[in-house]
UniProtKB/Swiss-Prot annotation:
Signal peptide: none annotated. This is Probable transcriptional regulatory protein SAV_6832. One of its GO terms (molecular function) is DNA binding. Belongs to the TACO1 family. It comes from Streptomyces avermitilis (strain ATCC 31267 / DSM 46492 / JCM 5070 / NBRC 14893 / NCIMB 12804 / NRRL 8165 / MA-4680). GO terms for cellular component: cytosol. Keywords: Cytoplasm, DNA-binding, Transcription, Transcription regulation. SUPFAM superfamilies: YebC-like (SSF75625). Its main location: cytoplasm. One of its GO terms (biological process) is regulation of DNA-templated transcription. InterPro entries: Integrase-like_N, TACO1_YebC-like_2nd/3rd_dom, TACO1_YebC_N, Transcrip_reg_TACO1-like, Transcrip_reg_TACO1-like_dom3, YebC-like. It is found in: Cytoplasm.
Amino acid sequence: MSGHSKWATTKHKKAVIDAKRGKLFAKMIKNIEVAARTGGADPAGNPTLFDAIQKAKKSSVPNKNIDSAVKRGAGLEAGGADYETIMYEGYGPNGVAVLIECLTDNRNRAASDVRVAMTRNGGNMADPGSVSYLFNRKGVVIVPKGELSEDDVLGAVLDAGAEEVNDLGESFEVVSEATDLVAVRTALQDAGIDYDSADANFVPTMQVELDEEGARKIFKLIDALEDSDDVQNVFANFDVSDEVMEKVDA
């Protein structure tokens, strides 16, 4: 989920230990399989596969599951599905724009899951293009803070194409053009700086500020969407203050 970055970071930590762990693993495995199918089984020559594997490893997905996914995707092992990426657009409560990225082998099932989740949680589906223009495709790398300063991170990635470094509290968010994502990730590695994830995300050009009630409603909608096996990512243009987040987390 991407919208409020601090929420996304908190949610990621919880996801590793909560009841959705198996579902999270399955989605990561699906990403690996598709990356291997489209770009080959060698992570060294397939940056998308490399990042998908790294993300899975950091979430403690077993190595044997990762290896099998790579082999299935590359056609070296039977059992791979024919997945396609589908984007759905809509509006959530309080006019929050929502992009839903699905990776599915059943278009009808995915469409039904998304529509049901939206309509049951105060959302509405929208026509293609009516929401996506509010987002730009960007490279986003999350770096655990540790002993690092913002200047440490900025110095490592500035010449690689990074546009900004944002302090998220316990981590830094490095934003770049999607085409510079690999260069930014490589620059961090060369500088000896570890990172939690490197993804091409849809970043909103403007955000809707939400109060506690609004935050709870949009989080409920996003949880319902992410509960579908076909939904890989949900992007939304909302923001909430630290004070509101503390109330929601309580």
